[in-house]
């Protein structure tokens, strides 16, 4: 199973986007007056989406849907939206995990995905991110933070240390192909029950048509994991893609 486009689908998307381009992220790098005011996705839209995800998973798994993992935190707007939604829905069992180096994109990002990324894109310090969350009425102390580059932090040692064993929602917003691949390899062994995977930059810069970025990483992941099937669900904006992941049951 995969979600690769055939030639007709590629051509159709190319023509459509020529006249209706996918919106770019509103901010990448450089100084801004107040980084906490930047919302790459409107918070209310994200809250509505997360509430929908919770309902989908609760129909399948019951009240305890599992933990929330976010890869690429930036100023905390996404993880803050999930936190507030979970509190509103009384998901007391859900834990929150934020994985980020808090230094923006790494240097090698410039050599990936048709050169669309630059070192330092989406940089927000850990201290500033905490301030942003406090201003959103989010208790950052109730979130588990894993700071560092993914090639150093996404490993079995941290799986055991964090006691990761039940995943509910995964928000992948780390942009590059290599980072998305590391994330998927990390969570793959944990996908033993239904979960929802959200790819924030699936169509950004038309990387899906170019067979790069998150599009490439996810399709390769599905190729390597035939025990998993994916069903696309409605996502929160045009540039993103979201999927319900289901382990294939062995009835033998």
Question: Where in the sequence are the language-model features?
Answer:
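A short alpha-helical cap/connector motif
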Residues: 1-252
